[in-house]
């Protein structure tokens, strides 16, 4: 197997290169945004740039990046575009810029939407250019650029401007391009289309000739483009050299065809045109397919196109076709061929009279039709309306190979999509893992096209939706597997031994050499299948490794996935491995197969089962694991061995590799998706079309649902009637009681429900009444029934005063339908979610709600807030891992809940015993839940009924107040409640108290009745299943857990009515969809009533490690984001309470009307300034340190030493002023920088109690969903903006801080970036040097924005700050030390021991020696040992590559007068204890 060539990484230009470029000089003259006086527009500039910069460099990405980054499209090209100045260079320049925007994944159409006037003219010229001759004005490379532009247009149908142009190309009139017989056949199939067709012809006759000609050109555009492509394809030779321009053109064209076929609006009309052109037949017979190297990607794309042309869907209705309907279509085709053969071709009688199953294979079709002449084959095809009729006495122009393939490919039996899927192995093999077209490397630049499905806005059917996600999920996990295999195998250093075998010169934690491998079982296939039901094997390894690694291997659990690898190295012993060269050649990798652990075998060869029992201790170091192999893969390998004489793969394995369990769940998720595709997915009717991206996007909104609920109990949502009125601005609120004293929460609100259907009323007065009625809310205060006399009986209440948009979100979430809540940072998303859950729980006690989040952290936050509301904890259940991080003492996991139920049962039975004793009833009523039930029925109820009969109303007179207390039968039981129980003020009040007491007693027995099942079910597993299926009302899990455990949940009969998803914009499309189907449908219908998604699509999307899947396939698009793009109505929360208003301004431009809650203006912490710092936020410019800005010791492992040291110096400065270290977090945009900063902190101040460590040092991506008071942010890059150009990352970075944000960056680079302008224009309005107030301690009373009374110091650069902090620390130590001496008169012994450092200092003679000691306690600025972080696998690098070395000389002195570090601290200098003294280095001691 040929190893893939290592692709080159595109190096982004540096700032100095950008400034030196000709383009930049032109930009500064004509269009740069920061230039005030610009030169007038000159068309020649565009011509020159296109010819000299773009064409001359063969469309080099670097040049196009520069142009696009300089805002060439926005500020020059489109701003000045008009038909008068349009030219080839102008058109091509715009197309290049748009394509580059798509490649960079930044919004491309905004500028066109702002100035749409000339777009139709521009688009028509693009169409004209795309059809131009390849040897004419437009070269093939230029036409490939145009094809890519058109592909982007067809994939942007959600943009009105684009859609209006594209619709003219793809609609029913495009069938003009069909041959007449085929057109008649299609119109006959769908009769209603003939009516439209006649109407189109009639309208065409009314058009003037010029407009008609223009319309005809647009309608025939795609037909002509196909013909043009076929001519280019035919010009590719079989073996002679071919230009790559031709190959790329063909690949891009097929990509365009796939995208047109995979979208229903375009497919509906285009599929017939494509079929009539026989494009697939031409392609499969072309020379390009036969060229192995050049045509490999083309062939893969062609297979995708073939799949979509035959997709199981009715093009006109959009309905998915069933297996039976597909079979019927196939039979109809064969029988029509047989009828034509019988009627007109006597030589085909045998074929015509055979049954379908005999003749519908490729072999039999070739046998019958192969002997026929070309003319006869043409006639057969014309009878089927596949080709135009052949005129008499004329020979066909098509060759025989084409005609035969046309008939055979059309009529051969196809394997169904679901069968193909079921026969597919789930584990990747070496052929897929290292195929660059399917699993590209990390260096994917976005230039070429790939044989990958795309996730856009719409899907053909649910099967198509699941299949695309299945393939992408499989390939994304394959990419990660490839990285793991390459890492583990290269660490093992496989070399060829002297005798030709394998010898391993290294070792790997995650891989072991295999000692023996045996297949032990191949089970019989199921009926109708040709692969075994089960294949098991035994793998023996020798665990001669450290104990903790041995424990990891022995800890492999059932269902863990491992990989079996065969290597046959050709390199001799001792050869060095070079990571920059292709991996496969170096290690000699031959095979990779996946397997799933069943268990480890004991001494007797039996599988050791997972369970609570301790594992047996096995002797020796040899361990054998029983594994399941993939039956489909095994079948394919065995067939290959038997039929083709290939070697038996299963006798060659010599390495087994395991993976981290957290990253190794791909097989379970793939199995879940495959199971979904094999079952009838019943998505609720009201969601089906929205999920596929069709129909009215607002159809699932509660206002359009037929089962809208008029009256809702808002429980404790409102704090007062004023809060309620403020929550519905523009509504007329009518309260059913007039007494203000009674207008207290909780409230029931009756909303006016509009029925969707109704007669139109013409009377204006009636309309006014309607509007008035529609805005009237009827509010009914009600009293929660008394729950008992104990303080804990009182319900917990919400204390948050929700805003009116939050109330709208809560209202929408309580109503049936789809609710989408967009929650910007700090707007209370979690509080809204919790209130919705609580309100559903109280309004619909019989319903069950499923909570799904992206992370365990979010789930824990939800649970902690749910606990604070009035929800009975016995109804809460948490599935999956992560509950150990919950900051509550309660365990909500399955077994935690089982233990809670058992403990609660004992508590309640004790209460029953106490009640029994108080009533003087003999016997043992509290023995079981059952006996307690009988006790309640015969002893408690009888007494209560007797009591009620005594105290109830007798006629018109009320009973005496004292009677309520006198006759009460449970006085003794309630003796431990706060006394007196009865107030004696009124009969109604005392009667309510009595009923409350009885409710308390009744609740005991109700709970015992529920817990009775735990007496009958004996095992913990059965009890936990019962809890899940019957008891729990609110069930929470992560999306990953849902995907892994769907099969088990469905098998248990798990049911739920509502789903609430938090962090919905961070969840993968497929992981959002699976939770909808965790239950089997009832009578063919889903019982799902509500789907609430809460997220923020302006923050970071799901994490996809491979750039190709992220960008090309758009796999990072969450379902939430797609719904927003499609136009599903959202509730946008619009008031934040996290950050200062000034900090909020840095990101609120990204949201609709995001304002601040009142407390952000009023609370002292928000109005007070940040002590010691002049500004609450500041952008600090960091220039190169020692001539180095960003460095990249490994690909994409970016570091910036200057910024890292500066950030740490500011952190230390803040801590020295008195800021708590845990209130400061340090964020950066790259992993490399994160590791470097951590190293510097460890070195400088990590173990110093005076300073300590910040709360977190992590990346912006990892910190999403968290916050802290003060954020120090390092942007790292100095050559190119990098991935901060994604505005979503910028929003996350800017919105993590509550009180202070300090950003360290190369300002000249970031201020020019168009996407970042709204934030950076505010940041650059303030000085770019750090302004500090060293004499102002924390906390301060100075108001934010006030001029300080202390002196402000301006820090110009990092060395200055480092030295300043160093001196400040030294001053603080000396002052503290002096203060201690005056205050503490220590005993002589302690002075001797505790002031070792001071004694040393006094003995030293020179200032220089004194500084040496201090520098031992605080590493001096010449100490650079932590300068540059490099990962463990770093290859040898020179100082110039890494930016610094570990020698003291690498960083010169930062100041003449002080020892010059980038100065910071490793231990406090007031070493008053022996322990502190020992922390100094050895030399000092």
UniProtKB/Swiss-Prot annotation:
Keyword Plastid: no
Predominant location category: nucleus
Reactions catalysed: ATP + H2O = ADP + phosphate + H(+)
Catalytic class of the enzyme: hydrolase
Residues with the N6-acetyllysine modification: 1051
Compositionally biased region (Polar residues): 1421-1448
GO BP terms in the entry: mRNA splicing, via spliceosome
Pfam families: AAA_11, AAA_12, Aquarius_N_1st, Aquarius_N_2nd, Aquarius_N_3rd
Annotated binding of ATP, by residue: 801, 806, 826-831
Effect of residue 1196 to A: Strongly reduced RNA helicase activity. No effect on ATPase activity. No effect on spliceosomal pre-mRNA splicing
Oligomer status and interactors: Identified in the spliceosome C complex. Component of the XAB2 complex, a multimeric protein complex composed of XAB2, PRPF19, AQR, ZNF830, ISY1, and PPIE. Identified in a pentameric intron-binding (IB) complex composed of AQR, XAB2, ISY1, ZNF830 and PPIE that is incorporated into the spliceosome as a preassembled complex. The IB complex does not contain PRPF19. Within the spliceosome, interacts with SNRPA1, SF3B1, SF3B3, SF3A1 and SF3A2.
Domains: entry comment: Contains an N-terminal domain with structural similarity to ARM repeat regions; this domain functions as a scaffold for protein-protein interactions, but is not required for RNA binding or for ATP-dependent RNA helicase activity.
Known function: Involved in pre-mRNA splicing as component of the spliceosome. Intron-binding spliceosomal protein required to link pre-mRNA splicing and snoRNP (small nucleolar ribonucleoprotein) biogenesis. Plays a key role in position-dependent assembly of intron-encoded box C/D small snoRNP, splicing being required for snoRNP assembly. May act by helping the folding of the snoRNA sequence. Binds to intron of pre-mRNAs in a sequence-independent manner, contacting the region between snoRNA and the branchpoint of introns (40 nucleotides upstream of the branchpoint) during the late stages of splicing.
Family, similarity comment: Belongs to the CWF11 family.
Name of the protein: RNA helicase aquarius
Organism phylogeny: Eukaryota, Metazoa, Chordata, Craniata, Vertebrata
Gene label: AQR
């Amino acid at each position: 197997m040929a190893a893939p060539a290592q692709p080159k990484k595109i190096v982004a230009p540096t700032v100095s290169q950008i400034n030196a470029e000709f383009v930049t000089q032109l930009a500064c003259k004509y269009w740069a945004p920061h230039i005030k006086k610009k030169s007038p527009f000159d068309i020649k500039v565009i011509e020159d740039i296109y010819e000299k910069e773009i064409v001359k460099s063969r469309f080099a990405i670097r040049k196009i990046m520069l142009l696009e980054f300089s805002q060439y499209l926005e500020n020059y090209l489109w701003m000045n575009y008009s038909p008068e100045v349009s030219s080839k260079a102008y058109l091509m320049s715009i197309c290049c810029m748009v394509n580059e925007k798509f490649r960079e994944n930044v919004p491309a159409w905004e500028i066109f939407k702002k100035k749409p006037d000339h777009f139709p003219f521009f688009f028509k010229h693009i169409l004209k250019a795309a059809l131009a001759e390849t040897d004419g004005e437009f070269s093939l490379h230029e036409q490939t650029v145009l094809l890519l532009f058109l592909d982007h247009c067809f994939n942007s149908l959600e943009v009105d401007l684009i859609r209006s142009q594209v619709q003219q190309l793809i609609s029913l009139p495009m069938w003009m391009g069909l041959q007449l017989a085929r057109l008649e056949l299609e119109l006959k199939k769908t009769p209603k289309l003939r009516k439209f067709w006649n109407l189109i012809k009639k309208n065409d006759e009314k058009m003037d000739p010029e407009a008609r000609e223009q319309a005809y050109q647009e309608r025939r555009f795609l037909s002509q483009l196909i013909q043009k492509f076929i001519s280019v394809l035919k010009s590719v030779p079989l073996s002679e050299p071919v230009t790559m321009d031709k190959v790329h053109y063909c690949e891009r064209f097929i990509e365009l065809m796939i995208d047109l076929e995979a979208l229903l609006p375009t497919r509906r009309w285009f599929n017939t045109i494509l079929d009539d052109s026989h494009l697939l037949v031409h392609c499969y017979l072309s020379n390009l397919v036969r060229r192995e190297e050049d045509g490999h990607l083309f062939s893969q794309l062609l297979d995708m196109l073939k799949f979509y042309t035959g997709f199981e869907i009715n093009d006109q209705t959009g309905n998915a076709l069933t297996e039976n309907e597909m079979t019927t279509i196939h039979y109809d085709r064969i029988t029509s061929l047989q009828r034509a053969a019988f009627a007109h071709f006597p030589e085909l009688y045998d074929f015509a009279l055979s049954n379908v199953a005999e003749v519908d294979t490729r072999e039999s079709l070739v046998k019958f039709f192969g002997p026929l002449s070309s003319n006869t084959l043409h006639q057969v095809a014309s009878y089927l309306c596949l080709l135009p009729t052949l005129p008499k006495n004329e020979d066909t122009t098509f060759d025989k190979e084409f005609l035969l393939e046309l008939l055979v490919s059309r009529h051969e039996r196809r394997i169904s999509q679901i069968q193909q899927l079921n026969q597919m192995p789930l584990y990747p093999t070496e052929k897929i893992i290292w195929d660059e077209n399917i699993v590209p490397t990390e260096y994917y630049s976005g230039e070429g096209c790939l044989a990958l499905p795309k996730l856009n806005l719409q899907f053909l059917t649910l099967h198509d939706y699941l299949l695309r996600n299945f393939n992408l999920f499989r390939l994304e996990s394959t990419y990660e597997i490839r990285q793991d295999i390459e890492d583990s195998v290269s660490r093992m250093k496989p070399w060829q031994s002297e005798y030709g075998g394998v010898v391993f010169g290294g070792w790997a934690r995650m891989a072991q050499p295999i000692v023996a491998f045996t297949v032990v079982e191949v089970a019989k296939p199921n009926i109708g299948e040709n692969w075994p039901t089960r294949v098991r094997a035994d793998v023996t390894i020798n665990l001669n490794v450290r104990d903790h690694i041995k424990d990891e291997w022995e800890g492999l659990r059932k269902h863990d996935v491992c990989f079996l690898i065969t290597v046959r190295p050709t390199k001799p012993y001792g050869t060095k491995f070079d990571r920059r060269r292709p991996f496969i050649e170096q290690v000699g990798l031959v095979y990779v197969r996946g397997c799933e652990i069943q268990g480890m075998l004991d001494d007797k060869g039996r599988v050791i089962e997972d369970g609570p029992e301790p594992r047996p201790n096995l002797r020796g170091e040899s361990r054998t694991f029983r594994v399941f192999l993939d039956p489909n893969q095994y079948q394919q390998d065995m067939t290959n061995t038997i039929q083709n004489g290939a070697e038996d793969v299963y006798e060659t394995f010599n390495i087994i590799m395991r993976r981290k369990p957290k990253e190794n769940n791909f097989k379970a998720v793939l199995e879940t998706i495959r199971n979904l595709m094999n079952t009838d997915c019943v998505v609720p009717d009201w969601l089906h079309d929205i999920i596929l991206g069709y129909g009215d996007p607002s159809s699932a909104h509660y206002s359009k649902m037929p089962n809208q609920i008029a009256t809702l109990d808002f429980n404790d949502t409102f704090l007062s009637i004023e809060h309620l009125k403020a929550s519905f601005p523009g509504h007329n609120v009518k309260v059913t009681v007039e007494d203000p004293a009674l207008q207290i929460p909780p409230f029931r609100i009756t909303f006016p429900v509009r029925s969707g259907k109704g007669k139109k009323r013409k009377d204006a007065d009636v309309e006014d009444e309607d509007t008035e009625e529609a805005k009237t809310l009827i509010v009914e205060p009600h009293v929660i029934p008394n729950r008992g006399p104990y303080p804990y009986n009182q319900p917990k209440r919400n204390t948050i005063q929700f805003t009116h948009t939050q109330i709208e979100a809560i209202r929408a979430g309580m109503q049936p339908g789809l609710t989408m809540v967009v929650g910007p940072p700090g707007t209370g998303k979690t509080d809204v979610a919790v209130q919705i859950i609580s309100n559903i729980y109280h309004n619909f006690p019989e319903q069950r709600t499923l909570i799904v989040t992206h992370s365990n952290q979010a789930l824990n936050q939800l649970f902690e807030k749910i606990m604070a509301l009035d929800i009975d904890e016995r109804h809460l259940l948490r599935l999956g891992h992560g509950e150990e991080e919950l900051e509550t003492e309660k365990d909500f996991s399955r077994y935690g809940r089982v233990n809670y139920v058992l403990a609660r049962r004992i508590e309640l039975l004790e209460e029953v015993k106490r009640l029994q004793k108080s009533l003087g009833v003999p016997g043992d009523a509290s023995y079981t839940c059952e006996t307690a039930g009988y006790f309640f029925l015969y002893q408690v109820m009888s007494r209560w009924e007797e009591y009620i009969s005594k105290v109830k109303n007798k006629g018109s007179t009320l009973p005496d107040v004292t009677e309520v207390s006198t006759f009460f039968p449970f006085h003794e039981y309630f003796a431990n409640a706060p006394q007196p129980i009865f107030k004696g003020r009124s009969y109604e009040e005392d009667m309510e108290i009595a009923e409350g007491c009885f409710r308390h007693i009744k609740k005991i027995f109700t709970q015992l009745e529920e817990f009775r099942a735990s007496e009958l079910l004996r095992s913990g597993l059965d009890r936990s299943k019962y809890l899940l299926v019957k008891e729990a009302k609110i069930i929470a899990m992560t999306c990953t857990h849902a995907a892994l455990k769907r099969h088990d949940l469905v098998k248990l009969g798990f049911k739920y009515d509502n789903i609430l998803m938090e962090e919905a914009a961070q969840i993968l499309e497929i992981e959002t969809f699976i939770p909808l189907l965790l239950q089997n449908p009832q009578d063919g219908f889903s019982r799902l009533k509500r789907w609430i998604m809460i997220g923020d699509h302006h923050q970071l999307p799901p994490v996809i490690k491979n750039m190709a899947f992220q960008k090309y396939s758009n796999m990072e698009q969450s379902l939430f984001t797609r719904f927003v793009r499609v136009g599903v109505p959202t509730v946008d929360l619009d008031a934040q309470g996290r950050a200062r208003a000034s900090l909020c301004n840095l990101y609120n431009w990204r949201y609709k009307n995001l304002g601040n809650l009142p407390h952000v203006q009023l609370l002292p912490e928000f109005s007070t300034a940040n002590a010691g710092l002049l500004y609450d936020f500041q952008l600090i410019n960091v220039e190169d340190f020692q001539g180095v800005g960003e460095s990249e010791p490994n690909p994409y492992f970016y570091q910036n030493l200057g910024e890292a040291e500066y950030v740490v110096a500011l952190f230390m400065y803040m801590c020295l002023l008195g800021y708590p270290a845990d209130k400061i977090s340090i964020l950066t945009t790259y992993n490399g920088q994160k590791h470097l900063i951590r190293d510097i902190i460890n070195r400088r101040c990590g173990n110093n109690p005076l300073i300590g460590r910040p709360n977190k040092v992590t990346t912006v991506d990892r910190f999403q969903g968290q916050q802290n008071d003060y954020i120090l942010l390092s942007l790292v890059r100095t050559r190119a903006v990098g991935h901060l150009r994604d505005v979503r990352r910028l929003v996350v970075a800017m919105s993590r801080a509550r009180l202070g944000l300090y950003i360290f960056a190369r300002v000249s680079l970031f201020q020019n970036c168009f996407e970042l302008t709204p934030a950076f224009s505010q940041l650059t309005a303030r000085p770019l040097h750090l302004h500090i107030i060293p004499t102002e301690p924390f906390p301060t009373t100075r108001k934010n924005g006030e001029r300080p009374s202390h002196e402000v110091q301006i820090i110009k650069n990092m060395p200055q700050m480092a030295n300043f902090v160093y001196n400040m620390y030294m001053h603080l130590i000396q002052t503290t030390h002096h203060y201690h001496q005056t205050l503490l008169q220590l005993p002589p012994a302690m002075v001797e021991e505790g002031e070792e450092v001071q004694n040393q200092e006094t003995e030293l003679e020179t200032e220089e020696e004194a500084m040496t000691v201090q520098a031992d306690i605080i590493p001096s600025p010449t100490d650079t040992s932590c300068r540059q972080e490099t990962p463990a696998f770093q290859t040898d690098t020179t100082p110039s590559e890494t930016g610094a070395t570990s020698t003291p000389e690498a960083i010169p002195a930062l100041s003449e007068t002080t020892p010059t570090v980038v100065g910071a601290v490793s231990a406090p200098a007031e070493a008053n204890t022996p322990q502190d003294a020992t922390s100094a280095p050895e030399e000092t001691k």
